[in-house]
Amino acid sequence: MRELIPYFINGISVGGQYALIAIGYTLVYGILRLINFAHGDVFMVAGLVMVYTTTAMPFYLALPLVLIVTVVLGFLIERVAYKPLRTAPRMSVMISAIGVSYLIQNLAFYITGGVPQPVSNPIPWISENVAVLGTSTKRVTLVTPVLTIVLVVVLVYLINHTKIGMAMRAAAKDFETAQLMGIKINAVISMTFVIGSFLAAVGAMLYFTNYPSVAITSGGMPGLKAFVAAVFGGIGSIPGAVVGAFIIGLCEEVIKGLGYTTFSDAFTFALLIVVLCVKPTGLFGEKVTDKV
């Protein structure tokens, strides 16, 4: 059992990183009933921007720039790819999302030449090793779950106690009625993408601190697992996305600790199939009348 302690610690950290990505999926779905397939690629872009900026400028300038670039990217994706299709059939919007995903990957391929970019200048302090319960790990492993919980608390407060948050809840509850009540739907949707992109950028900086390089496909698997976490917890539910992410992160790492490393990824997608068969609404999800 003692041998599993490092895997439990890593699992909590990985779960926190998945949670930051999963919230982006669940926020967008809550309002637009859309799966933003480009969200994992936004996460990847944040990693690439971190690699380039941290080697070119001081960290106190580089890290805010990562957040700004990622947020602007998320905003532009919504305005260019989704806003013109607001009244279009949902399938058209989904196809647009897939197209945006491939566009971002190909632009990243053009910039990087398809070569993984090494994380040669990791974020100081959180990239240092520390001893925890008799095992050595990077400080980012401990920082990630704490920072995730803090950001989730701030987000929940924003949604429940601010005007923009109440507008987001109204739009999620009934999109058409919110429009008739005078809520600026376009501003609400843009803010949703901004928040999701911001959290994805934070998750990327934490995630890639533990990895030697960033490739154009680096957002694929974390994005898919975060999506599974959102579905498992109940897509559209922020607490559900967070709980689902931590459960998946812990299970994956414990499976690795038990010696079934090659099965850890398969477990996540097997879980998705089981959830969709047994409880399609997820742990905290609610039934909806509309169907895709």
What are these regions (language model features)?
Residues 16, 25-47, 87-92, 164-167, ...:
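Short, non-helical or kinked segments that cap or interrupt transmembrane helices
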Residues 9, 31-76, 80, 85, ...:
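Membrane-embedded helix boundary and interhelical linker motif in transport proteins
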Residues 14, 133-214, 238-243:
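Helix-loop-helix "hairpin" substructures at the membrane interface of multi-pass membrane proteins
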Residues 47-52, 67-73, 100-108, 147-156, ...:
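Hydrophobic core segments of alpha-helical transmembrane domains in multi-pass membrane transport
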Residues 58-100, 107, 243-248, 279:
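Alpha-helical transmembrane segments within multi-pass membrane transporters and channels
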Residues 1-20, 49, 60-61, 88-93, ...:
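Membrane-interfacial amphipathic/re-entrant helices at transmembrane-helix boundaries
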Residues 84-85, 90-161, 188-191, 212, ...:
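Transmembrane helix-bundle core of multi-pass membrane transporters
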